Amino acid sequence: MDGSAACRTLIVLAWCRVFAARRNYLRTRMISVEKIGGTSMSAFDQVLHHIMLQDKSRIYGRIYVVSAYSGVTNQLLEHKKTGEPGIYALFANGQDYMVALANLADSLKAINAGFVSLGLPLDVANAFVDQRIAEAREHLNALRHVLASGYLNRKSVLLAAREILASIGESHSAFNSVEILKAQGVRAILKDLAGFHDSKAWTIDERIHHSFKDVDIANSVIVATGYTKGTEGIMREFDRGYSEVTFSKIAVEVRPDEAVIHKEFHLSSADPNIVGLANAVIVGATNYDVADQLADVGMEAIHPKASKPMEHAGIPIRLKNTFEPEHPGTLITKDYVGESARVEIITGSEQVTLVEIHDPHMVGTVGFDLGLVGILSRHNISYILKATNANSIVHLLWDKAVTPELIAELQAKYQVVTVKPCAIVCVIGSNIAIPGVLARAAQAMAEAKVNVNCISQTLRQVNMQFLVDREDYKPAIIALNRALCLPSRAFVPLGCE
């Protein structure tokens, strides 16, 4: 090699080092807001090593919005799936809740004991539990006396009690997280947004703004509670989905490079519990429109009312699997469209009911469905799907929305009202507006002996919706995933993974 060639080589190497250094610098300066759910929080050793400490160059510049440990909010409010009452129901029904609060303290301390090996100072953590339970007891007792007076609206008082109780779980997990991080030598800051020790009449946005306005995020690790106290009441609209609202509002406030949601699973082409893990394809990339479609049938990547502010702010959301830290997960952005036509997700729900109105006078009548929509509105019902023909209108509703009162009002006004429990199966993708997808979907279900009761698709063609009998829900998911998401991969029979 002559001198000039050697010189050029040295220059190239030098520039490579410069670019590598700059890339590493930018990586270390990246700001992210990250939500960690309750199931992941209960496996905090995995969270600590797979998320918080996994990349030594990315320890700082991160805000973690944490949920309560798995099962705690069920104990505080009610079981999310079964509805089994918790402490809130005791308060709301005028029953004694002191013993339940004492049992809660024991449960939280048992959780604390499980994290001693990670460096959690047990005496400090247990003292926090005792203090917070005592404060909550005082607040609840005060509310009970106010409720007994009859001077204030019962609904507002109960909502305040519900928020006080809900906040305990997030404050507990956030406090523990900070103490464990400090024990690991990390500069960690607690942002307890429950506001137990202040009486400021801030809105949720104001509390978040004041909490983060003077924080050096780039050089800190911040752990924030998923619950935020505010004058409007975060649970008034979102109830158990409040942690996503806090996550969203913090992201909009600090404008991170990325918002990350850590779950115990990947966003995949179909539920691995139905199709088998080997047949569940990780989505990888999609857009906010697809995320909205998922939420509409109960498969929430993130609640639409929490995601919309981030979408408008241009903040990308990354969904990651807590237990696979090296995998980039799935990135949700505003304008993503797949380079090639591809069905991304097959999903749906078995917890839906078809309500059909049949009336021969409907044909040619302008605004016939206006009265029907008015009835749904009075019952505070949002429908999932709507389909019509000359004499019939079908609305797909969540099971819990189909009350005897609703059906009685419909039957009093319309000739024939048919109520049929069923299931919805959706074929979703950011780029599926091509000939043949609907035909392949119908063929796949026909081969699986699945009868389609109703079909819906809009002009944007991001979501094909099929109503099927409930017993056909899982066979339909398996058939559609196999036909539309695994065309170039070998199907692995269930049980053979």
Which positions does each model-derived feature cover?
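A conserved regulatory-domain signal marking ACT and ACT-like small-molecule sensing domains
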Residues: 328-497
